[in-house]
Amino acid sequence: MSSALILVAGLITLPGVAAEKKTVTTNMKSNVQTDYMNGLLKLALSYSNKEYIYATTSEVYSRPRVMESVKSGSISVMWGGTSEEMERDFIPIRIDAYRGLMNHRLFFIRQGDQARFDRVKTFDDLKKIKFGQGRSWQDASILEGAGLQVVKATKKPSLYHMLDGGRFDAFPRGANEVWTELSAFPNLKLTVEKNLVLIYPLPTYFFVSPKDPELAKDIEFGLESAIKDGAFDRYFYNSPEVKEALGKADLKHRHAIRIANPYLPKATPLDRKELWLDLMGESPKSVSEPIAEAAQ
């Protein structure tokens, strides 16, 4: 072997040229959405020249605890609906992980209540319905801001039991969430409402610890790269969660009622059409839209 080849071989094995290893910690799995988001995170970071190692918390943290942990840096990244507050406290990756699918809310209702919802045609009709929501959820603020009645609970599982027990009338969930969640509560007399879809813009973003801006850059670079080369679309459409939602929700044949999201940050990239699905045959709507308009 020539001296030049020996030198090259030696350089290849030097520790200094090995890929940098970095641990990314997320909250322990709590639902099927965790699988989707973790998978998308790994797809994004596969475009980085760093070697990422993935870890989770030792137990499922509550939402407030997750937020505090991301602020402190003990959790690297979380995900959820955006707001001015979220984008102030964390580093937002402004690419909707679900391409607008989560903006479309279907209702859990009690079995036997469908006839009541068949009579809902306008926003004023919707104001007669009591909705269940998580106490710290952005959705609760959006519904209340629109003038809708909201009953809150601290823990999400409680909401299904409260609906079953008659504490409120409907529990709105993302179109990609309802089917899996329905199967998780087989002993409750609940079903998915058949004809309505409530729409408001609430993108699902990755939010990175302010202590780790390099991770935020890698996630954003990876998602943008995956959009450009088609990997994002392949991942999205091959997700069992998304396949089930698009197959069962029948969104184009539902009666749509839109409400505004007054908490949607101005930096939301509604003008980037490649980031959003056209699920209702329409373009994404901005927060300036009247809250009482129903799609005809």
Residue ranges and their predicted role:
Residues A18-F90, I219:
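Extracytoplasmic small-molecule ligand-binding "clamshell" domains
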Residues E20-T34, R119-S136, D169-A170:
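Short loop->beta-strand "edge-of-pocket" segments that line small-molecule binding or catalytic clefts
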Residues L40-I53, R119-D125, R135-K155, L182-N187:
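Ligand-binding cleft/hinge of the Venus flytrap
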Residues V60-S76, G145, P157-N176, F185:
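Short helices/loops that flank or line small-molecule/ion binding pockets
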Residues S69-K71, M78-F90, F171-E193, V197:
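A ligand-binding cleft/hinge motif common to bilobed small-molecule-binding domains
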Residues D96-S141:
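A conserved helix-loop-strand patch within extracytoplasmic ligand-binding domains
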Residues G100-L106, D113, A184-E220, V242-K266, ...:
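Periplasmic-binding protein-like
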Residues G134-A146, L223-A294:
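Ligand-binding clefts/hinges and TM-proximal coupling segments of bilobed small-molecule sensing domains
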